Amino acid sequence: MSASAAAAPERYVVLGNPVAHSRSPFIHAMFARQTGEPIEYGRVLCPLDGFEACVRQFAASTEAGKGPARGCNVTVPFKLHSAALARQVSARAALAQAANVLRFDEDGWFADNTDGIGLVRDIQTHAGFAIAGARVLLIGAGGAAAGVLGPLIEAHPREVMVANRTRERAAALVRRHRAVGTGLSLRERPLDDCGGPFDLVINSTSSSMQGLATPVDGSVLQAGTLAIDLMYGPAAAPFIEWARAHGAQARDGLGMLVEQAAEAFSLWRGVRPDTLPVLRALREQLAQTGA
């Protein structure tokens, strides 16, 4: 899909509500410069009750001097609705029951979920942590957890424990992943009885963003545990501070954000960008703005 630098830029956006805070335009602009792909990437605020109309309006839109709309990222609260708009849905999006990427193909739309593979690549590439053979605790059983559980399982950990305040929701998520979770221990537990310690602890809840205490006991951690909050920036700070206070290594979800974006870019353009310089630039930007 590569084109000359003089080609009219094909258009992509991130759709959400809210969406003004999104770092996706910065990330994809760096990917475009790095790869020479002629794209333009923006933000679109969709009404809470008008997501489908918003997507269809963008897909059909034209702009003078620019190429057609080719796809979009989808963020909260619309990920659960986006897959229903597609003619074809990837296996990982079907398993997650949510999609964060749409590609506008001539014969219909294609939906995918790149969150989980983005997390796995961040853990293994940027954190240098081997998931294979590890004991993993996934805190939460909502949409964020559903998006990452399948790719986590496919990275061959020894055990995955899903802990959630509402235990039945965790049980439903585990049941849905039984088919891909062969050859490992895949279980659910209440938040106050997780067991442990674990090698990898992932917080998919919004506890940090809400300023709440981490919803599990520090006994789930040990020296050498890698603890990750899927949030980034100040929103992840309470979890990171808690994890470090208990002797764990800790990181936020910024690497996941960049890696899932790279997977989407590859899906759209057929070329995979180098994520490390983009992640470094984004961390520098966040350090300067404090956001």
Regions found by a protein language model. Name each.
Residues A3-A127:
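Phosphate/diphosphate ligand-binding glycine-rich loop within oxidoreductases
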Residues V180-R251:
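Rossmann-like adenosine-cofactor binding region
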Residues L276-A291:
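A short, charged, Gly/Pro-tolerant segment at domain boundaries
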Residues A5-A8, I131, E154-H156, V216-T225:
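Short, conserved loop/helix-junction motifs that constitute active-site signature segments
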Residues G16-P18, A111-G116, I123, A127, ...:
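Glycine-rich adenosine-cofactor-binding loop
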Residues E154-E159, A245-Q249:
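Conserved S-adenosyl-L-methionine
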Residues F104, G116, A223-T275, A281:
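Rossmann-fold NAD(P)-binding glycine/threonine-rich loop
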Residues A155-V180:
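NAD(P)-binding Rossmann-fold cofactor-contacting core
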